[in-house]
Amino acid sequence: MKCYIKDYPRAQFVRTDWENLNGTWDFGFDDENAGEKEKWYQEFKGDKKINVPFTYETKLSGIQDETRHDFIWYHRTINVDGVKLENNRYILHFEGSDFITKVWVNGAYAGSHRGGYARCSFDVTNLVHDGENELTVKVEDSFDTQQPRGKQRWINENFGCWYVQTTGIWKTVWSEYVPKISLASVKMTPDLQNAALKLEYEVAAAEKDLDDDLMITATVSFRGTTVAKQCVLANQKHVETTINVAYEGTVGLEWGVRVWTPAEPDLYDIDFAVTHKGEIVDTVGSYFAMREIRIDGPNILLNGHPLYQRLILDQGYWKDSHLTPPSEEALVEDIDKIHALGYNGLRKHQKTEDERFLYWCDVKGMLVWSEMAAAYRYTDYAVEEFTKEWMEIVRQNYNHPCIITWTPMNESWGVSQIETRKVEQHFTEAVYYLTKSLDTMRPVIVNDGWEHTVSDIITLHDYEEVGDTLYKRYTEYKDQILTTEVYHSGKSALANGYEYKGQPIIISEYGGIAFNNDDSGWGYGNKVNTKEDFIKRFDDITTAVKKIPYCCGFCYTQVSDVQQEINGLMDMERNFKVEPEIIQEINERKVGYWRTFM
């Protein structure tokens, strides 16, 4: 897209005056939690170096210590341009830092943030000066199962499908100069039926500047051709408007609206300019897509057409950097290889991925289910932390067209008694309706896999390894499964008190075939040791799922091996275990009721 800058962290809201703060930082463990008392933010006492944004547990950090350290400190100098400070604010951004992040600049406290997966930002304008400034960060983390932790272990060793913990900064740290009168955010909602885009602007300005001389101009273009331009008055902090994006052009060149699909992921550029008293004071580059995702009875429609989803579970782990992508190129490689395997989408599992990943999914046409990292205990504190961060994530990633489904919870993790316990059921309902209050256009699957309460799609997890058994289970016992008379995978499809209401049904986890050449690691079912055995089982169960007439999609587990879990289609270095064209042919083979839409 026109606004694209390599390695820029916030790909949907781009300013050019920024600095990447990744690289070598001073670092230290504070196992006695003495740093604040000893004022490390004034005189740093850490004795190590770390390569940010990689956590100390990883090889790429330069430390590679997998033991638990609950209190850690970072330090570096930052250079600030005093001339730019005259008309700008200086903002520090942390794309991801787990879990409690505290920031000091030049020894003065700048603020804190709780949560590990959403972006946090600090306006430190009043704490910096021209030239070199001291930036100090403390991060507190723990094995507390009440906090959202996703696939991070909460004991000292890996177990099951839980892996080495991620402590501290694990995504890009960066700074930008933001004009004092500026665009704080833009929420973009496509209206395909009316060929329009709804824009909701948030303006950052002093009250005295919110006058009739403050304007926002949006310019929409498609592949270099200007489609629409609109200027609106911005004399209040929240401004809503709608812009028509149908292109009429000259006679013979009309093409109306270009829609976004996995096959043709057409995107529009949109540029924003804020003017005050006739002078441009802020510019932001972005993009959007005209696409509609909605539920129609048992079908999921993309732009009004039935969508069959061929998804793969993607946990976003790398051998030497764990949750942190080693580079932007690694993100692109994953997307390209997932496409090569014949999938049109992915379920980003228990992780909010780097926003650059979402950018490339937008550009390359990869469907995404966005999922929250789970907590593993139900308490008032867990409810508060989960809800707060989930709302931050939905708002942060709302504009990405690749995201077609929100999935706050998985397999009753954090709500382990949801089948019968009303308070846990109420929590999932609250999360569902809160998500809907922010986003009316996307389906929400509150508890993926089983024990659903309110949900726009009913999803089922089943790791049966015999295709015929799998097929018969969901054709001969469909009604009993959906009325909970028969449990699938030992679990009820719906929680007590809830009924199936005709929603679309997807097998959103299956497969997980363990395949490597030694006896280490694990997967689901009996392990296979040869390529031929793997292909036979993969074909058997995938074909069985696709033949289920009412099932409108599937999600195979998983993209790559993750530490002790060896059930990926690739190993941790992203080498294919089986020729991708073989997997692609099986995935894309048209069978059963859905063959028209596959």
What positions do the PLM features span?
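Extended acidic/polar, glycine-enriched regions
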Residues: 126-132, 202-294
